[in-house]
Amino acid sequence: MKTFNYNRAEIKAGIVHFGVGNFHRAHLEAYTNLLLEDPSQRCWGVFGAMIMPTDGVLFNALKKDDGIYQLTTCSPSGEQDSMLIGSLVELAWGEIDSEPIIAKIASEEIKIISLTITEGGYKVDFNQSRSVFWYCLLYTSDAADE
């Protein structure tokens, strides 16, 4: 298995990402992980902001392993390639405490705030005009005003 080729203690979060699900971890984190191998790019670690009530199991699993996880890709021919991803250097779950998320967003170190919205991750009630994600944004906004 391939592993990352950098010292995680040297990595600073420059990205806050909302929605640290499978899609995010298989794409943005994988590319960020490769970028961090360049010593001049050690300011692009990811702060994972988890805001959904259902994020608890994933949050606890990632937190237990300090944000490090294994990514396995499969080629059309069936070959598998696994690597350790270390770019997720900080993690917070808004259900427990939203303050670290708000503070990180306000930090001068943060240059990018990104989010993942997938059709299966945020349930839309077509009888209503708003999705669960919209309510999470309102919740986060209300928390910032307190």
Where are these regions (language model features)?
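Short alpha-helical segments and helix-capping/turn motifs at coil-helix boundaries
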Residues: 27-37, 94-103
